[in-house]
Amino acid sequence: MSKSGKKLTQKLKKNLPVTGPQAPTLYELMQWYCLNTNTHGCRRIVVSKGRLRRWIWISLTLCAVAVIFWQCALLLMSYYSVSASITVTFQKLVYPAVTICNLNPYSYSKVKDRLAALEKETSQTLKNIYGFTEPLIRSKRDVGVNVENSTEDIFLKQIPLYRLESVKGSQLVVSDLKTKKRTRMSAKVIHRDAESVQDPGNMVGFKLCDPKNSSDCTIFTFSSGVNAIQEWYRLHYTNILAKISMEDKIAMGYKADELIVTCFFDGLSCDARNFTLFHHPLYGNCYTFNSAERGNLLVSSMGGAEYGLKVVLYIDEDEYNPYLSTAAGAKILVHDQDEYPFIEYLGTELETATETSIGMQLTESAKLSDPYSDCTMDGRDVSVENLYNKKYTLQICLNSCFQREMVRSCGCAHYDQPLPNGAKYCNYEEYPSWIYCYFKVYKQFVQEELGCQSACRESCSFKEWTLTRSLAKWPSLNSEEWMLRVLSWELGEKLNKNLTKNDLANLNIFYQDLNSRSISESPTYNIVTLLSNFGGQLGLWMSCSMICVLEIIEVFFIDSFWVVLRQRWRNWWENRKENQAEDTPEIPVPTMTGHDNPLCVDNPICLGEEDPPTFNSALQLPQSQDSHVPRTPPPKYNTLRIQSAFQLETIDSDEDVERL
């Protein structure tokens, strides 16, 4: 192609309208897209004749787009949902761990010396309130207990007990249970077992104050004096146990051969050696059957009562602490070998003189983690440190979080839960305000102000045993005499009395059958199904494919962005040129003659104003390097050409341009 043909082609392309992604405006870009897209609704908006028909197609297209967004939102929500499936299998099942505790944590004969002063003040308080006198059987049992003859009530001084006379807001009228002296005080009132005060005259409570601020006091009230005395006793009891070493507490508790009288499992005899010691802070020495610490786990070969665990427990009700344990019997918990036995929350109680049969049904559950649920697989992604060194559970996390806040707020750890590293258990001598601080932290924990409930998450996998309990009178009237005689003879070396049926409890715990249920979750949609449903919705409502979606993304986002950017850049550049043209001042060119001419500086040929230059001297003047000698411009040949022929003829293609 000749040089003139190329110039003509460039000129024609410059004058032709620009379409497609290089369109100068958004309107032209959208018009080009609607004419060239495979989405029929958008094309009908442009090619339709008449305003009414065009608005109809606009409405239909917008409705189709809205339906697509609605259906896709439903698909996304369904993608994060799960469906549960239940599978029932029949196989030999591993027998779970069974933890057994006596409701009385320590033998009274072994712990009475440490609790003598506390029990003396408790008995005196009951006498002051209700005229209570100690039973004769207790008086005989307490013979030999060394109690210091002190007129000062240590425990009542630390936590005074009051009877409420009247309550008006924070103004109280109370009477001291020891001195009967009525006083008026201002304190907050917290009702432990009632929402409101019905009859203040029948309510008993104790007062707790912050040692650092004597005006910050709270009275905890109870609807019954029994509950008030028990709560008051437990606070002092916990304070005493916190100062006793673990070795001494184990020695004060029941031994395995004392608690377990007879044992059978799967038709075979067993004894105390098949149980593992587990010391619980509230129930003392507990014993776990089929613990993971013993190595190989036992398996149930058959279902039914004859193939489970059968034990007879010695309760020893005469050694019970009357203010701590108001019920007689035992407590058991069925749990996995890797789990911590929270027997105080989930345990099942056994009655004395009763045979308790418990049938078990195993259910294993497995949930999906993020993004389907907020559960955790092993607790490693939870910010709360596990203080129990056992498999993660929600209860372990909550207790560990509470203990951490207890140490942070009160400076010491509560006795009911494991001890964190570097912390000590709370007691009056080292931490005088720990009880008041404990109630404040516990209130915040219950009201979910500590953040424990939000930080702790449920475990994704767990085992659960559904228990079916039945009771029967044991031993029967005809077998009671010989059975108690035989058991008394077998335990004669350990006991110095004849057994009664109220000293024993019979437990039979077994699998009802060997069917185990497995509940597992699976995603309702996978990624393939989700994309297929997306494609179906797009094809149904907009007759477009994934390529059309990519085209929409390119035109409506990428190309539109560059069109707007080019428009703003062009406007900015034009405004900048106009501002520069307006701000440029006209600089007058001064006339330089004679010595004012810079070419004459240090030039002896330059003459002064009084000496006009001659022709020869003018030729000797130096010339400027940047100066150009003006020449005659060439003629403008373009004015001689005839351009009307190009304006009348339409050029259809580049070949015509090259031909011209």
Curated annotation (Swiss-Prot):
> What is the regulation of this protein's activity?
Originally identified and characterized by its inhibition by the diuretic drug amiloride.
Q: What is its main location?
A: membrane
The UniProt keywords, alphabetically, are: Cell membrane, Disulfide bond, Ion channel, Ion transport, Membrane, Sodium, Sodium channel, Sodium transport, Transmembrane, Transmembrane helix, Transport
Please list the disulfide bridges.
C101-C286, C209-C217, C263-C270, C375-C460, C397-C456, C401-C452, C410-C437, C412-C426
Describe its membrane topology.
Multi-pass membrane protein
Annotated localization: Apical cell membrane
Cytoplasmic-facing ranges: 1-55, 559-660
* Record carries keyword Cell membrane: yes
Keyword Transmembrane helix in annotation = yes
Q: Which residues cross the membrane?
A: 56-76, 538-558
Q: What GO cellular-component annotations does this UniProt entry give? A: apical plasma membrane; plasma membrane; sodium channel complex
Any single biological process term in GO: sodium ion homeostasis
Q: Extracellular face: residue ranges?
A: 77-537
Q: Which reaction does it catalyse?
A: Na(+)(in) = Na(+)(out)
Protein purpose: This is one of the three pore-forming subunits of the heterotrimeric epithelial sodium channel (ENaC), a critical regulator of sodium balance and fluid homeostasis. ENaC operates in epithelial tissues, where it mediates the electrodiffusion of sodium ions from extracellular fluid through the apical membrane of cells, with water following osmotically.
Task: Say which family it is in.
Answer: Belongs to the amiloride-sensitive sodium channel (TC 1.A.6) family. SCNN1G subfamily.
Q: Cite the record's note on assembly.
A: Component of the heterotrimeric epithelial sodium channel (ENaC) composed of an alpha/SCNN1A, a beta/SCNN1B and a gamma/SCNN1G subunit.
Q: What is this protein called?
A: Epithelial sodium channel subunit gamma
Which organism does this sequence originate in?
A: Xenopus laevis
This chain is encoded by the gene named: scnn1g-a
